[in-house]
């Protein structure tokens, strides 16, 4: 949420007066990517919302719980959970090392599941609860798998969370949806990802 699509969503919500819990793995600036959770918090508050920047590695269950608890204590509850964190490497099977494979699945699939799970007890108390995942349609066409099967598997895991949780919590009134750009967006994260230059030409 400190840059790119996540920050854009947070700023748009802030225009409507939203309070935003902004979680990122580190407060240090990325050598290739602009912004930190603190600069993002300033931008959110400039739009009219309130921001709580929290350092949180979403692979760490205890830290996720602490971040959620801090947000609830500060703002009184949670109405919307946006799962935007994502690790990306657009490489084929032989070019993808297992450390990167594990990272993509830990952040994209497991992280989305964990953050949603920790937010749900609070969402169930909300009058109009939503979970929004930045993940693609479950399109089984081979063209989405061939060039970067490991990344697609990890992103589809996020989409399966949408499908499953929407069904599981529909009677309790929790709306669970996915948002996915129709075309690739030329963000700094895409540009700097291994294999991202080819995608940039399509955006």
Regions found by a protein language model. Name each.
Residues 79-80, 102, 129-134, 174-177:
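Conserved catalytic-site loops of classical short-chain dehydrogenases/reductases
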Residues 92-93, 97-102:
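Substrate-binding pocket helix/loop in short-chain dehydrogenase/reductase
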Residues 116-117, 163:
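A short, exposed helix-loop element centered on a Lys and neighboring polar residues
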Residues 67, 81-82:
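Conserved hydrophobic beta-strands of the Rossmann-like cofactor-binding core
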Residues 16, 74-75, 91-92, 118-127, ...:
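A short helix-coil junction within the Rossmann-fold of NAD(P)-dependent oxidoreductases
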